[in-house]
Amino acid sequence: MLTIIDFNFKRSNLLKMFLKIKNIPKVYWSSEKPLNLKPKISTFFFLCLGLTLFGLGEGLLIVSFAGASPWSVLAQGIALNVDFSTGIITIFVSIAVLLLWLPLKQKPGIGTILNAIIIGLMIDVCIKFMPTPENYIYQILLAIIAVLTVGLGGGIYLVANLGAGPRDGLMVGLQKKTNLPIAIVRAFLEITVMSIGWYLGGTVGVGTLLFAFGIGPAVALSLFIVGKFFN
């Protein structure tokens, strides 16, 4: 009985620790600065690994057919009200988010560029080779796996510190300004974006809700694991 109580207590403490993470941990393969054109091989490797996992997760979410990510819902909602495609709107939204970096003093890097390239390629690979589960329960399970995969990849590439993607950079910048836990900042962003997109006519599914409420804790958990494992 004591063993079970001790286990539950330790598990509760670990949960509180990663949910309260406020900073991106530094490990031996982290770059000293985002604008680093000659990173270490290990830094570049983990950057690409993280972005690959991120793109894989995004692709799995689309393939699950359980609902798109909140930012895709926003793009879809805007596209329904203007004469542009969802893809073009996604680019415009990314540019707008990058402009929000200026007051937050966020710095781009090679990771900011590779973010779009690698994630886009992985999404296409998933859509081409990964079948959509016919069973609704399996679709939801795949959506959960997708959110966890995006969180894991996001944590790894953020620790590489070679420049975040537009949305992750916004998350990091807002965290520094507010000093709130990363899990809360990311969840706030995703829920806000999802709500605006839904109001404009975008389609929200179970996968969208899983992403909106789950990606913050998933990224925080990844940062916690990477920080503990490599230190």
Task: Give each language-model segment a name.
Residues 2-231:
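Core subunits and conserved enzymes of cellular information-processing
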